[in-house]
């Protein structure tokens, strides 16, 4: 038992699991219908990245070659040094993105379903309703004492709530995924291995490392209708996707391996960003201006300079 003082001093940052420290990952992907569409949209997506011709060290040929099949359109494939690729579709902060993708330069980009890169930590998924692990039973009263008989297992759906992006890419992808399960025109149903995927829901600790992983083998069965209104006070459009699963497994992530991976991937990534000359870590010229190690004078002068620029622009805009 903790006393109140011990709780405040020692366990304030590691007390209980917070409901917003989670992330969702496509561990495996369905492999139908997307291959026929990838070739037609990969060049278009590359031209609309909004960056120069060399994006994160990838050329147009590399992007076309690195496209894989995911839900009718695919995502851009992230290959870590370990060779494991995952598809991040939602995370709370950059710490969770860093713990999953293992690179500061790439991990800050949320990979969308249609090869479009977003320079953010990713907030497309804002809620996950985990299903219950529940057995069906009935009570037999034919004996002196009631006897409980297990009749089977009840599988509740997995419900993931999305924020619709500015071009509704995730909404269209989920709609087509449901149509891939059963064609709305012909009524033909796809094979399970062609439309099933594994969604992994990770629980993260306060330092960003995942400690629990829940894996679902499932496919989407419904996409809710977003509510559109002129009286909505400019709210963000949201929709829910319901997944039916066959298998749900929960397991712990080995902490020692997570720490070893963090040391090899994250810390080395930080050193590569900050620069390491002759074994001594030092800031580069561009990053040294952002450091607080040089005192507060430089930061205050930079803030004052920026404030003056903003004030000048505000006066001009006000005059117009």
UniProtKB/Swiss-Prot annotation:
Coiled coil region boundaries: none
GO biological process: viral tail assembly
UniProt GO cellular component terms: virus tail, baseplate
Annotated localization: Virion
Induction description: Expressed in the late phase of the viral replicative cycle.
UniProt keyword list: Late protein, Viral baseplate protein, Viral release from host cell, Viral tail assembly, Viral tail protein, Virion
Residues making up the signal peptide according to the UniProt record: none
Ranges that cross the membrane: none
Purpose of the protein: Baseplate protein that forms, together with gp48, the baseplate-tail tube junction. The tail tube first 2 annuli are formed by gp48 and gp54, which are in continuation of the spike complex. Involved in the tail assembly. Morphogenesis of the baseplate is completed by association of gp48 and gp54, which bind the upper part of the baseplate dome to form the platform for polymerization of the tail tube.
Known partners and oligomeric status: Homohexamer. The tube second annulus is composed of a gp54 hexameric ring. Interacts with the tail tube protein gp19. Interacts with the first layer of sheath proteins gp18. Part of the baseplate macromolecular complex which consists of gp5, gp5.4, gp27 (central spike complex); gp6, gp25, gp53 (inner baseplate); gp7, gp8 (intermediate baseplate); gp9, gp10, gp11, gp12 (peripheral); gp48 and gp54 (proximal region of the tail tube).
Annotated protein name in UniProt: Baseplate tail-tube junction protein gp54
Species assigned in the record: Enterobacteria phage T4
